[in-house]
Amino acid sequence: MKRSLLFSAVLCAASLTSVHAAQPITEPEFASDIVDRYADHIFYGSGATGMALVVIDGNQRVFRSYGETRPGNNVRPQLDSVVRIASLTKLMTSEMLVKLLDQGTVKLNDPLSKYAPPGARVPTYNGTPITLVNLATHTSALPREQPGGAAHRPVFVWPTREQRWKYLSTAKLKAAPGSQAAYSNLAFDLLADALANASGKPYTQLFEEQITRPLGMKDTTYTPSPDQCRRLMVAERGASPCNNTLAAIGSGGVYSTPGDMMRWMQQYLSSDFYQRSNQADRMQTLIYQRAQFTKVIGMDVPGKADALGLGWVYMAPKEGRPGIIQKTGGGGGFITYMAMIPQKNIGAFVVVTRSPLTRFKNMSDGINDLVTELSGNKPLVIPAS
């Protein structure tokens, strides 16, 4: 869309020759050329074993990969290489929340207790309940992880649904829900449980019906097949077995591929061929400003979190960089990052497998710089001499 509009502008300018002298116009670069300038630096700077990068800029889609799918195999990641998206799972859980909101199944301010299993207890703080919007914005006052997990366990297999609701029955909140932001994986697993209970369907069925099947995401799952496990990228450091990850159903358990994540990301971005989803504004709406919190914990990994949405984190414009809405992830030897400038129809998804040298910030800084340059990539009029 962006490139076709720019082309129209060039034609219009070229036709105005009777009154004014033609003004030379420099064409914008292809997105692929800009991506190529950054991708090498992102890969080598992150210290990754392997990397896959998907970028959408209006009508342009770019895929780049580096390194190996497994240490020593000399095979580059492909669009159908299986990856763990880790905490980007939370964006899909929030998407499910919006879909059920629009269907009238739940409300943002519904208390979690409304959708708890029979006989379960949900803690409050001086009578203030945990609501669904608290779970989706890291403002529930629940801990990042449920206490008591065994050391060195495989990722995304604990706590199970039964274990987390049992823990909740004795948990105590140390702050009022909504008063502070503190990153919580536990909260998103409880949110997925609540959405399943509200709908009367298993969450995996909802996930397929509402998200993966409509978008054609055939390799996005919690229960990978033998073929998908063979395609799973393996990190040099921190690799975990290819198990079902239903325990982390709302927080981090999703397996996917770069190709599927491109399909998922496209729903937020318009082009001549795709229309931004009519639910995208609600999925990316900002709920809280940072100034509303007494404390912010664990939200600033790729940059200062200026506002929180439903799973999404917003970084306000700063020092020439436009506002970016983003989400980070990591686990099982993978680190992931998605960054978007939706109003410019620009988005990037990157996944890397870890080595002992891997650094998240080098990766996220590179992606932030990449989408920033893409957003400023427009034709320039050079004044006639």
Swiss-Prot record:
InterPro entries assigned: Beta-lactam-related (IPR001466), Beta-lactam/transpept-like (IPR012338), Beta-lactamase-like_AB/R (IPR051478)
Biological process annotations from GO: cell wall organization; peptidoglycan catabolic process; proteolysis; regulation of cell shape
A Gene Ontology molecular function term of the record: endopeptidase activity
Cell compartment(s), UniProt: Cell inner membrane
The EC number(s) this enzyme carries: 3.4.-.-
Coiled coil: none
Annotated Gene Ontology cellular component terms: plasma membrane
Top EC class for this record: hydrolase
Deleted gene: phenotype: Disruption is viable and exhibits no overt growth defects, but produces morphologically aberrant cells, particularly in cell filaments induced by aztreonam.
Gene3D superfamilies for the chain: DD-peptidase/beta-lactamase superfamily
Family: Belongs to the beta-lactamase family.
PANTHER family: BETA-LACTAMASE-LIKE 1-RELATED, PENICILLIN-BINDING PROTEIN
Protein name listed in UniProt: D-alanyl-D-alanine-carboxypeptidase/endopeptidase AmpH
Organism: Escherichia coli (strain K12)
Species classification: Bacteria, Pseudomonadati, Pseudomonadota, Gammaproteobacteria, Enterobacterales
Gene name as annotated: ampH
